[in-house]
Amino acid sequence: RYYHDEIGYNYRLEGLQVAVWSVSLKYLPEWTKRRQEIGHRYLKEITNPLITMQRHPENTTPVFHLFVITVPDHEDFIRYMAENDVECNMHYPVPCHLQKAYANLGYQPGDCPNAEYLAAHCVTLPLFPEMREDEIARVIDLCNAYRQA
């Protein structure tokens, strides 16, 4: 899932995918609005100083496809959330320049320090349109309680 040995492309959509996506498109504005509500709530209510959240320029409107935070130790945070029945994920734990598929380009660890830092510290919080208010509140409460005792 996270490790790529070769560069690949797949531009084909199968008929079933097209049918599902065609039906789903009518819900996109509603889903986007809900994702934005949840994302803005996270931004406002998660106040733990160990958690850094992405900030967006005022002239932009984020959709919150993912809600990515950075923490000092992403494995510890993911474990903590899992112990409290909240699933979080790492996204792209290996930066592109260190993937086997790009080994021929000669990049080494340290060549892209920002990408490497983010790969080691990013966590994606749950955020999906169907989240209930109690689930959202639980994520917020757990984030705020993380390593604060």
Language-model features, listed with the residues they occupy:
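PLP-dependent aminotransferase class I/II
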Residues: 1-149
